UniProtKB/Swiss-Prot annotation:
Compartmental location: Cell membrane
Subunit record text: Interacts with atp1b1 C-terminus.
Family (UniProt): Belongs to the NKAIN family.
Protein name (database record): Sodium/potassium-transporting ATPase subunit beta-1-interacting protein 3
Keywords from the named record: Cell membrane, Membrane, Transmembrane, Transmembrane helix
Top-level lineage group: Eukaryota
Membrane topology per record: Multi-pass membrane protein
PANTHER family in the record: SODIUM_POTASSIUM-TRANSPORTING ATPASE SUBUNIT BETA-1-INTERACTING PROTEIN 3 (PTHR13084:SF2), T-CELL LYMPHOMA BREAKPOINT-ASSOCIATED TARGET 1-RELATED (PTHR13084)
RNA-binding as UniProt keyword: no
Length: 181
């Protein structure tokens, strides 16, 4: 491959995807969001695989990355629907924590401009050591921050998909031309 523009761009996109996924992973860990943590972990592994395939001219690894991007886009569309409460989904359920805790998005209490204070729990609720928290003054609501994260992931995945298909095409064309010589 004399000109590496496609490969170099795919390497850049994969690196950017890795950085964005690591940032998202940190905030999902802070919020104990186990489903996104698992998804981000798998995504990071597959992006590393795609990066390796791109650097080492291994089209099968790039194909695996390409297939994964379709699943990753679907997962992020689900997250957008979840936080925007589309189709009967509710951001107030414990779905993202696999129903094992009452934690929510870290951004719910720590978003830009958010001020939170503890509110006494009603006597009818037995929350153990948990308490109610009142959050006010947020510049942007937490669900929109989560939607922006997912939208960025979708955008990077779609761009990565296009470049991965291009790089696969170029690599296989080069392999075919080498076989016919």
């Amino acid at each position: 491959m004399g000109c590496c523009t496609g490969r170099c761009t795919l390497i850049f996109i994969c690196t950017l995807q890795m950085l964005v996924a690591l940032e998202r992973q940190i905030f999902d860990f802070l919020g104990y969001q186990w489903a996104p943590i698992l998804g981000n972990f798998l995504h990071i592994i597959v992006v590393i695989l795609g990066l390796f395939g791109t650097i080492q001219y291994r089209p099968r690894y790039i194909v695996a990355y390409t297939i994964w991007t379709a699943f990753w886009v679907a997962w992020n569309v689900f997250i957008i629907c979840f936080y925007l409460e589309v189709g009967g989904l509710s951001k107030d359920t414990d779905l993202m924590t696999f129903n094992i805790s009452i934690h929510r998005s870290w951004w719910r209490e720590h978003g830009p401009g958010c001020v939170w204070r503890l509110v006494p729990a009603p006597p009818s609720k037995n929350l153990g050591d948990h308490s109610f928290i009142s959050v006010t003054g947020c510049i942007i609501e937490f669900q929109y921050i989560e939607v922006i994260h997912s939208a960025v992931q979708i955008l990077l995945s779609l761009i990565g998909f296009v470049y991965a298909c291009y790089v696969i095409s170029v690599i296989t064309d080069e392999e075919d031309s080498c076989r016919h010589k």
